[in-house]
Amino acid sequence: MNLIPTVIEQTNRGERAYDIYSRLLKDRIIMLGTAIDDNVANSIVAQLLFLQAEDPDKDISLYINSPGGSITAGMAIYDTMQYIKPNVSTICIGMAASMGAFLLAAGAKGKRFALPNSEVMIHQPLGGTRGQASDIEIHTRRILEMRETLNRILAERTGQPLEQIAKDTDRDNFMTAEKAREYGLIDKVIETTK
């Protein structure tokens, strides 16, 4: 059962109830707290575009706690983050794995963060296909091209050489927040806001 908390605010016109995500959106905060599929990507992209229309000069914060998911859905979010005018700050809470880690690294340089006990995991794209040999060959070429694209972007975002990215993403590569900072996936580990 998925319970979404409601927040009640007092206004000069009385009380107003929001689901917690709508209330956070008012403060330019977007939550990515699930696996990434087309529906999730469409929702995140719509929120990014809405916040750009509201104020193109004000930063957006994207909090990430995601095991990853669809490459094409994740790339829709990535491309939108790069396309819009506001800087998108990324913050890892819990786990940013696979496409979640990719989106974490996609935040504006200097504005990519992780909480101290969060984890980041990078790896090569996963895929599986069935069918005729020629179709399997087509899908194999496609996933290899995707791997090259993802590795190239990660190299640009982290400052790591492409060969190092290819080696480090060959298998599941788990990192603490501090290791992710050293690697260049994030810029800072947030200790406290107090």
From Swiss-Prot:
Top-level taxon: Bacteria
Broad class of the protein's primary localization: cytoplasm
UniProt record, GO biological process: protein quality control for misfolded or incompletely synthesized proteins
GO cellular component, as recorded: cytoplasm; endopeptidase Clp complex
Subcellular locations according to the entry: Cytoplasm
General function of this protein: Cleaves peptides in various proteins in a process that requires ATP hydrolysis. Has a chymotrypsin-like activity. Plays a major role in the degradation of misfolded proteins. ClpXP1 is involved in the complete degradation of the Site-2 clipped anti-sigma-W factor RsiW. This results in the release of SigW and the transcription activation of the genes under the control of the sigma-W factor.
Protein name (database record): ATP-dependent Clp protease proteolytic subunit 1
Name of encoding gene: clpP1
